[in-house]
Amino acid sequence: MDQCVTVERELEKVLHKFSGYGQLCERGLEELIDYTGGLKHEILQSHGQDAELSGTLSLVLTQCCKRIKDTVQKLASDHKDIHSSVSRVGKAIDKNFDSDISSVGIDGCWQADSQRLLNEVMVEHFFRQGMLDVAEELCQESGLSVDPSQKEPFVELNRILEALKVRVLRPALEWAVSNREMLIAQNSSLEFKLHRLYFISLLMGGTTNQREALQYAKNFQPFALNHQKDIQVLMGSLVYLRQGIENSPYVHLLDANQWADICDIFTRDACALLGLSVESPLSVSFSAGCVALPALINIKAVIEQRQCTGVWNQKDELPIEVDLGKKCWYHSIFACPILRQQTTDNNPPMKLVCGHIISRDALNKMFNGSKLKCPYCPMEQSPGDAKQIFF
């Protein structure tokens, strides 16, 4: 983090100089244009277009040329100073960041199978972002064959999202109505919130839309049980149509943030319906890598400095715990209290009859004959009674 602050400080200096240089350049050139324009007008008025210049005017023109030359040289000198500031940013980046991160990479990630998976993840990310042309180009260059059925849902979702961003609700409403049963099954309130926003957009039209708003309120009927209070608030706002909702106690209904919220809700519920995560795997992996990389580089340097390279053998475990934040928590992790090892698919957590949990490897090492004594309580039990648990 300190490295980022250092580079950012240098960058702010450059941006400040750019701003000052731009203002200085603009002011200097405007003064020159006004000066030369006034001089030209004075010469034409005094001597005409074809008359010879007097000695005084020749001297004035010489001074004008010198002023122009001095201004240009001053601007060029200031521009060179900016170049040196820009180069300092590059030096700060080189000094504070490690340009070679291959030491913490895994060679296996560049094998054919891993490369194919990476390309698939990138294609899916571009589909999610609506960058269909880029995704198709990547498929052609990498030799991937993508079923059109994989692309179609993303095309539709991006079309609806683009409409929501410009406050057009009709495509999203049509999608929500057509998927109503599945949305209800996952306890989604998307359809109601879309109807609510449409009703609010009618309220913004004032008394002109009063009859249409009352007619549209019939769409709230299926949601009366779960959203009774919200519907009551919406109907109460009709009383203030004449004076304007913005001048009423219901002004909170016009909050612009709810349009950003509806985009997030639609993305979340639509992805859940398609069995997808809200964020693309590529963006999640990239964010996690940005957090973990500095810590991994530091621990790698310490390991090499202390000549204990065997501590990190580049397998599926790290020599230290890297905290990625709660945003990257997807499943619970169990560490066996006996062997002090994290459980895996091959060594899963096992629940004993007494309720205590240990790893399968610990279970196999602890039982004697047909009996197993729990390491935390005096209960004896059969190893076969232990059950695998899933978090």
Swiss-Prot record:
Q: Quote one Gene Ontology molecular function term.
A: ubiquitin-protein transferase activity
EC number(s) recorded for this UniProt protein: 2.3.2.27
The CTLH domain sits at 153-210
A GO CC term attached to the entry: nucleoplasm
Q: Which UniProt keywords apply?
A: Acetylation, Cytoplasm, Metal-binding, Nucleus, Transferase, Ubl conjugation pathway, Zinc, Zinc-finger
Reaction(s) catalysed by this chain, per the record, are: S-ubiquitinyl-[E2 ubiquitin-conjugating enzyme]-L-cysteine + [acceptor protein]-L-lysine = [E2 ubiquitin-conjugating enzyme]-L-cysteine + N(6)-ubiquitinyl-[acceptor protein]-L-lysine
> InterPro entries given for it?
CRA_dom (IPR013144), CTLH/CRA (IPR024964), CTLH_C (IPR006595), Fyv10_fam (IPR045098), LisH (IPR006594), RMD5A_dRING (IPR037680), ZF_RING_GID (IPR044063), Znf-RING_euk (IPR027370)
Q: Superkingdom, according to UniProt?
A: Eukaryota
What are the residue ranges of zinc fingers typed RING-Gid-type? 336-377
Q: Which residues form the LisH domain?
A: 114-146
Pfam families cross-referenced by the UniProt entry? CTLH, zf-RING_UBOX
Q: Where is the protein found, in the record's own terms?
A: Nucleus, Nucleoplasm; Cytoplasm
Q: Which residues carry this modification: N-acetylmethionine?
A: 1
This protein's assembly is summarised as: Identified in the CTLH complex that contains GID4, RANBP9 and/or RANBP10, MKLN1, MAEA, RMND5A (or alternatively its paralog RMND5B), GID8, ARMC8, WDR26 and YPEL5. Within this complex, MAEA, RMND5A (or alternatively its paralog RMND5B), GID8, WDR26, and RANBP9 and/or RANBP10 form the catalytic core, while GID4, MKLN1, ARMC8 and YPEL5 have ancillary roles.
What is the official name of this protein in its record?
Answer: E3 ubiquitin-protein transferase RMND5A
